[in-house]
Amino acid sequence: MNFSTILLLAVALAMDAFAVAVAAGFQLRELTGRRIFRLSWHFGLFQALMPVIGWLSGKAVVSYIEAYDHWAAFILLCWIGANMIRESFDTSSDTPQKDPTRGARLILLSLATSMDALAVGFSLAALKVSIILPVVVIGVVALVFTWIGLLLGNRMLSSRKVGKQAELMGGGILILIGVKILHEHNVF
């Protein structure tokens, strides 16, 4: 597998991470370097680790996991998105927005955006491709795309001066990404 093919694969895998990062950036009123690093690092790390897991597992379990990976991503994204939408309608001012760069939400988003990378790992094993270069490129591209997505999403928030609507829109975007994943797997 040549470098340009690996790079195109990495960019394709990073699109979901980019879209989720835009939604997260849109939700976060204060985007610090620490938050950018945390989300970018986790998305890049998960995007890099999932192909390794798939590659190590090999072809034996491909048919079992491929049949359900898109459903897992869809459920995780819809669950997080629905919670964000519900929280956007909470009128109590003392209820803080949940930070997508911390805790369980960070891990769930990282998992949801990296499910396709698991299947790529299975494919790389089936093709008998070395895993090292693809994993490094996939991880770095996901990290960079997440970083850019956070900055773009936050810039859109700053330019519009919106409040709770940002969380509503971010939740809607996550649900749409989940629906897109199902559509890509020909569920409907």
From Swiss-Prot:
GO MF terms held by the record: manganese ion transmembrane transporter activity
User: Is the keyword Nucleus assigned to this protein?
Assistant: no
The UniProt keyword set, sorted, is:
Cell inner membrane, Cell membrane, Ion transport, Manganese, Membrane, Transmembrane, Transmembrane helix, Transport
Organism, per UniProt? Desulforapulum autotrophicum (strain ATCC 43914 / DSM 3382 / VKM B-1955 / HRM2) (Desulfobacterium autotrophicum)
Role summary: Probably functions as a manganese efflux pump.
Keyword Cell membrane set for record: yes
Report the protein name in the record.
Putative manganese efflux pump MntP
Q: Per the record, a Pfam family?
A: Mntp
Specify the domain of life of the species encoding this protein: Bacteria
- What cellular-component terms does GO give this entry? plasma membrane
Hey, which family's this protein in?
Belongs to the MntP (TC 9.B.29) family.
Bilayer disposition of the protein: Multi-pass membrane protein
**InterPro entries from the xrefs?**
Mntp/YtaF, Put_MntP
Chief location category: membrane
